[in-house]
Amino acid sequence: MRDPQNIAEVSALGIDLMGFIFWPKSPRYVSQISSRAGIIPDRVNDDMLDGRKADVKYVGVFVDDMPQNIVTRVYNFKLDYVQLHGNESAVMIDNLKATLIPDIAPDIKIIKALSIREADDVKRWREYEGHADMLLFDTKCKCVGGSGEQFDWSVLEGYDGNIPFLLSGGIGPDDVERVKAFKHPMCVGIDLNSKFETEPAVKDVEKLRAFIDKIR
């Protein structure tokens, strides 16, 4: 998400979270406005924040980024969640929280994405117990998210952790019944991305509206 009008329209659909990709290699990358001066930090395009609704939480997605870059974007974009989609360790999460809490973002939450292909991949959740506030189970692939591919959700039956999670990985408009049939006590939501886009970073509002209406 980066187009102000699209952000406002999607925010009005009653969603809970909205993601912003801060990985430079992604076609969905959200850039900042350069200050053109090394001693002055870059800033956000204020238009992106104008359509924000109070009940929509902002999620910044990062991939093995430097902590100072994450902190800057948390502050500039007023992020509620940081989603780590690379090989970030539990120690890195703890250090990031220590930097952000309490002065910069006292209520910040950390989501750790785990790439899933088989049951053993799910077991990695134990590395983040007591560190991540939420997990996101995505499809393991050569790319970093946004593949449009799904994994076998039945492997999540083996997840016996106490960290709530989001279900991700190629969920599309035709998956309404499959999503409604999926049950797990720790699943708190689903992640909708590439299957609801007209182009990278631009969501098809009507497709989203129809899907959300059917799910709820």
PLM feature segments, named:
Residues M1-R216:
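Conserved N-terminal beta1-alpha1 strand-loop-helix module at the mouth
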